[in-house]
Every structure is written in structure tokens, then in C-alpha cells.
Amino acid sequence: MKYMVSFDQERMLKPAVIGGIINGILGAICCLCYVIGGAVAAHLYVNAGGICDYENCGLVGAISGVIGGVIASILSFLFMSAYLSALGLKAAMFTGASFIIGFITAIIFGAILGAVGGVIYVVIKNR
């Protein structure tokens, strides 16, 4: 059975443009995803009955940034390993060192930027 894919301009163009704009903005602004993740974590914390102050929301944001950093570094390592294997390169020494450096960097920046997101959430909520 053959399926035909057709470009329905009326239905596909607007979502594709909006998605492209979002991808462009998030890709252009370094680490914005960590800040947004921290703000979302703070929002969920406050909705669960937590206290909406700088310390608690910043801590929840920092924890979410650490978790995000761990996940991002593991996925990045797996994708990079598969990419290097597909190219036929053997970079065993490079991938181990780059994983450790990337892992530590992602955790540090994730914690900092996640905390910033949690604090930004408090500022916006208390306006």
C-alpha cells in the first residue's frame, strides 16, 4: 500500500513557521531551555503547594537544571558516539574525556541557569 504525502499549505505552513521561530529563538539564545525548565519546575512546585519565594523556587529550578544537564549530556554522548561510528572514526579516548568535561559543564550551567529560571518565575508571579 502506497501513501502519498502532500503539502497542505493552509494547514502546514503556519505551524511550521511557528515551530521554526521557536527553534530559532531557543537555538540562538544559549541555554534558554535550562531557564525555561527552571521556571516550569518552580511553577509546578508552587502549584503543588510550595512556598513562592526566591530560595525555594531557585532551589527547585537548580535541581531541575542538574537533572536536565545529566540527561542532555548522556543524550549528547550517545548521539556523538553514534555519529562518529557512522563516519567510521574511532575516537574512544576523545569520547571519554569529552563526556566527562561535557557532563560537569552541563551540570554546573544547568544548575545556575535553572536557578535563574526559578527566580525569574518568582519575579513574574509576584508582579
Swiss-Prot record:
GO terms for cellular component: plasma membrane. It comes from Methanocaldococcus jannaschii (strain ATCC 43067 / DSM 2661 / JAL-1 / JCM 10045 / NBRC 100440). The chain crosses the membrane at residues 16-36, 59-79, 100-120. This is Uncharacterized protein MJ1491. It is found in: Cell membrane. Keywords: Cell membrane, Membrane, Transmembrane, Transmembrane helix. Its main location: membrane. It is a multi-pass membrane protein.
